[in-house]
Curated annotation (Swiss-Prot):
May play a role in septum formation. It holds the Pfam family AAA_31. The keyword Nucleotide-binding applies. Induction: Induced by albendazole and thiabendazole, which inhibit the GTPase activity of FtsZ and probably septum formation. This is Uncharacterized protein Rv1708. It comes from the Bacteria. It comes from Mycobacterium tuberculosis (strain ATCC 25618 / H37Rv).
Amino acid sequence: MPAGLPGQASVAVRLSCDVPPDARHHEPRPGMTDHPDTGNGIGLTGRPPRAIPDPAPRSSHGPAKVIAMCNQKGGVGKTTSTINLGAALGEYGRRVLLVDMDPQGALSAGLGVPHYELDKTIHNVLVEPRVSIDDVLIHSRVKNMDLVPSNIDLSAAEIQLVNEVGREQTLARALYPVLDRYDYVLIDCQPSLGLLTVNGLACTDGVIIPTECEFFSLRGLALLTDTVDKVRDRLNPKLDISGILITRYDPRTVNSREVMARVVERFGDLVFDTVITRTVRFPETSVAGEPITTWAPKSAGALAYRALARELIDRFGM
């Protein structure tokens, strides 16, 4: 089980130095809360946000709840949310495993891992029976959070698996031996509805759908919910939508407010109270190779992902 990678620390240090020192760890603006409101106690979703206290520490760990972070539309903050939700869960004492199921390797890169240099990744786990999760596991620098990395090699997996018996359950079989070590497994699915994404959905307890507040996202949301229904009927009876996360929300625009209203009207309580607003902080964290919870721990983005973690723990009761 590799505890790190040659050159990883130096890459991370170099990336961190590329960002001006005064860009880090700004204090929050006066009046900033975990759930910004629009006045009269109404949150950005148009509903009064629930007050969820910090979760109690866990005396033991596992078996993990497996959650797919999924949206076939790219650029909705899916990978950013996977990293930062995982880091926030780790802050609350939950052990988290992140699984990068995107050949672009954005999740791995977002944690400062030079994924393009790796000899073994999730691709090897899926297509080589003798390679296990432990053979590719990386202990990240983030507290309580491990990573199963990916790179461009994964793009060949769909073709390599197409003739395999039980190909949709390949990831489930690989994850099963490690579930007792973790409280949450977050799978960062690629922005498509191909075999890799179906593998992610087929082994999960639920799916979180990050979606940005734009009208084009509404149609993608409908298509994805149809796919979830099909996977539930054919492959994974326990699959359900754990929540819909609104990202890149700008309360100043009519478009954002109208899309928010439509999503809440359609999906009701499935929409998380936590809303991720637009901020320059997230691109900075991608360059630094660390979550916003450590890069700018008092920023609005960090507070939001901690609030999301509390909501998720409350929904799953763990």
